[in-house]
Each structure stands twice: as structure tokens, then as C-alpha cells.
């Protein structure tokens, strides 16, 4: 899978308002070129944030050798060249999402 964090997409939209830096009427793929496996992200979150462990699925992480060739590759060079390539990782994006959900639940007594 590839990741597009909403903060990165929003930043790209704001940057695109500057017509001197971003050519108009072009399409850009706004995504990290990092390939990731949701099972590995969930396992890392469980390990690094034990207070969330009961909220996250306990899934067997497949060895990298079993994942090779299972993902499509994408070329993000055009978007990276215009907007920069400093995208949030899938791990950071999902960690922020889980934290937001837990915080919302606390505030709303869910």
C-alpha cells in the first residue's frame, strides 16, 4: 500500500495556490512512495504504544519475502519535484489517527 496523509494533501493544496511554483492544469500524485503493510504498522504501534495494545489488532506480520512482488509501484517524482518529498510515513499518519480517535472517545465519553 501507499500512504497519503491528509496534512500532506492539504499542504499540497495550499502550495498549489502559488501559480509561479505550481503549473496549472496538471495532475500530481500526492503520496509517499514508501510501501507499507498494515499488519506491520499495527504490530509496531502495539509494541511502541502498549497503552493502545488492547485497541489494536494482534495480527501475524508476514516476512518481507512473502510480500515482495505483491505491491504495485508508483512514480511520485512529478509531485515530489513540485511539492517536495517530505511526506509523513504511514506509521506516523496512522499513529496520529489512532491518537485522535482515542482522544475523541475520551472527550465524548464513548
Locations of regions flagged by a protein language model:
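Substrate-positioning beta->alpha
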Residues: 1-15
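Residues that recognize and position ribonucleotide moieties
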Residues: 2, 34, 72
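Residue-level signal for the nucleotide or nucleotide-sugar donor/cofactor binding architecture
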Residues: 4-7, 36, 88
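Mid/C-terminal beta-alpha module of Rossmann-like enzyme folds, strongest
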Residues: 12-64, 98, 105, 109-110
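Conserved C-terminal active-site "lid" loop/helix of NAD(P)H-dependent oxidoreductases
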Residues: 63-84
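Conserved C-terminal helix/tail region of periplasmic/extracytoplasmic solute-binding proteins
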Residues: 85-86, 91-109
Amino acid at each position: 500500500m501507499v500512504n497519503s496523509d491528509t496534512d500532506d494533501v492539504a499542504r499540497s493544496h495550499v502550495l498549489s495556490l502559488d501559480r509561479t511554483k505550481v503549473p496549472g492544469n496538471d495532475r500530481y500524485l500526492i503520496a509517499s512512495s514508501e510501501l507499507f503493510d498494515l499488519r506491520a504498522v499495527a504490530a509496531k504501534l502495539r509494541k511502541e504504544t502498549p497503552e493502545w495494545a488492547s485497541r489494536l489488532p494482534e495480527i501475524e506480520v508476514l516476512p518481507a519475502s512473502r510480500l515482495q512482488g505483491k505491491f504495485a509501484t508508483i512514480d511520485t517524482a512529478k509531485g515530489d519535484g513540485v511539492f517536495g518529498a517530505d511526506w509523513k510515513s504511514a506509521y506516523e499518519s496512522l499513529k496520529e489517527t489512532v491518537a485522535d480517535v482515542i482522544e475523541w472517545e475520551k472527550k465524548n465519553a464513548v
